[in-house]
Amino acid sequence: MTEAIRPMPEEMPVELWRGVKPSSPAWQGRVVSLFVAPKSAEEMVSLSNVRAMADRGLEGDRFFRDSWNAINRSDKAVSLIEDEVLELAAAELGVESIAQKSRRNIVTRGVPLIDLLHREFVVGNVRMRGIRLFEPCPHLVKVSKLPGIFKALNHRSGLKAAILSDGIIRVGDSIALQVNPAVATA
């Protein structure tokens, strides 16, 4: 039986979110994996670090501004997903890991992504702003070749974020809310 895939709205309603719930206002998060894909249908490549460029994206990624498929798509700067969600989804699918197949750039641990929605935060020394929660898309199912991935990631497929400052993001970097963005930019 094939998986029923329906088009998803541009922005997922917050009340449908099935990702990590905030357990305390003092969570401590970090980057556990980094991925880019040079082209839309190519496999994600695991990296130990990646250059983030404000208003452009991650160097080497398919959505890096000025690449053929990122023109006029400012909401495609970077994607984040919770490692805790990936572990649950992998267990549901009966596989060891789906981090690379999730097609997300930054895999986080200890970060309730819903806390970053419409807020500024830092990954290492790179400032970002959470733009929207999102759903898996039919392209993910096609490229991942993993039956059931759409359902496993439904309502918990991650966060799109805009990159606000240049810098290098590394595996192991901390992730924190930007307490006072005005002070950081002064």
Where are each of the predicted segments found?
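Metal-cofactor-dependent catalytic cores
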Residues: 1-186
